[in-house]
Design a protein with these regions (language model features):
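Conserved activation segment of eukaryotic-like protein kinases, specifically the C-terminal portion
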Residues: 28-41
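Activation segment
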Residues: 44-49
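Conserved catalytic-loop aspartate of Hanks-type protein kinases
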Residues: 52
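Conserved C-terminal C-lobe helix
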Residues: 93-106
Length: 135
C-alpha cells in the first residue's frame, strides 16, 4: 500500500502496481505485495469504501513501526487476515488518542467500521484530521 500526496496537498491511498500483479493470480493464491493492508472482506472478493478505512489503519500502523500480522507469512493472510483478530494490539507507549483512532479503522464487521466522515470527526492528539484526506 502506498500513500500519495497530490500537488494540491491531498493525501490518497493506493496500491501501486497491484492491478497488474493481481491479474496473474487467483484470490486463493494472491502473491501481491501489500496484502497485509487488505481488509478482511477484500479476501472474500468484496470491496467497500470502508475497506480503505482498514487500509488507512494499516498505513498508520506501519508509520508507527508496526507490521500488521507480522506473525504470518503473506501467503497465509488470505485465510487469516481479520477473520478473528485485529492487526493492532495497543502498546504501552501508544497514545490513547491514536489508539482510539486506529481501533476505529479495524472493526471486523464492515457495517460497524467507521466511514471516512466518521473518522474525520475523531480527535487525534488534540487536532482534527484535515478534511483534505480523500479515500
Amino acid at each position: 500500500m502506498n500513500l500519495f500526496l497530490t500537488k494540491d496537498g491531498v493525501l490518497k491511498l493506493g496500491y501501486y502496481g497491484l492491478t497488474t500483479q493481481a491479474e496473474c493470480y487467483s484470490i486463493k493464491n494472491w502473491k501481491c505485495e501489500g496484502v497485509r493492508s487488505f481488509a478482511p472482506e477484500v479476501f472474500k472478493g468484496e470491496y467497500e469504501m470502508k475497506s480503505d478505512v482498514w487500509s488507512l489503519g494499516t498505513a498508520l500502523l506501519e508509520l508507527m513501526g508496526i507490521t500488521p500480522y507480522s506473525d504470518y507469512d503473506e501467503s497465509e493472510l488470505p485465510t487469516k487476515s481479520g477473520v478473528d483478530e485485529s492487526p493492532y494490539d495497543k502498546r504501552d507507549n501508544d497514545s490513547e488518542d491514536m489508539s482510539s483512532f486506529i481501533e476505529c479503522c479495524f472493526d471486523m464487521e464492515v457495517d460497524d467500521r467507521y466511514n471516512v466522515d466518521e473518522l474525520l470527526d475523531v480527535s487525534v492528539m488534540g487536532w482534527r484530521m484535515m478534511s483534505s484526506i480523500h479515500l
